[in-house]
Amino acid sequence: MIYAFFLSEQPKKLRLWIIGGYLNLLRTIKLTNTYSEFLAFLMNYRGKSYSQFKQDLFVLFISKNWSQKTFMEIGVGDGIEISNTYLLESQNGWEGVLIEPNREFVDSIRKSRSARHIEAALTTRDIGEVEFFTGKRGVFASLLQTGSVSEEASYHVKSIPVSKVFGDYKRDDLSFLSLDIEGNEDEIIIELMKMDCKPFIIIVEHNYDLVKSYRIRQSLKENSYKLLLRSISEVDYWFVRSDKINLQE
């Protein structure tokens, strides 16, 4: 019954793939009270998720007893569809910053979101303007020109370095960071971990890139982050700072 509703809005093939991954998860770990509570949380929020794989509900579940509700979403898209922060902001009182360089989404973000929008591409260092490649309907866009994106256009956008974006943040100032830029997520994470800011929750896309995946995992684990529920979302990682959650596995 749980699997009948889980991601029920997704295509059947994708839904079965996700269910298979989740069954594998249940075979390899002991189902503790925490995991049972998470499943119940998903049931209560059925139909209210805007994320691709319920990432927003995971954040709400982990942060349900937190008083601080701040986010930064890097790679926002139109601000609503498959956004990891729209639900947090629109229905749960979260505040934050959005970083999205794709000019196709500027009007939509301004109309649908109250969070501050930085129209620039996040980079590891200050390099001025960068070439930005857009894919079909602008959904997939990247600083990298790769065969995985059917490029229709490219143009130059402003860049903003990690040091400038996170420079004023103290260690505990940011509750949630979402990073999905179809490119150098590993380099961004490594650079971020050199700074004082250590978000409580980090959701970062790896998109099955083995080198990128390894670099992300190593960097975050070295900084006391715990990887959770890996089999639920295969395309990205859900990390929580170890001092912000107590899971028994």
Question: Whereabouts are the PLM-identified features?
Answer:
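Phosphate/nucleotide-binding beta-alpha loop and adjacent structural elements of enzyme active sites
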Residues: 2-249
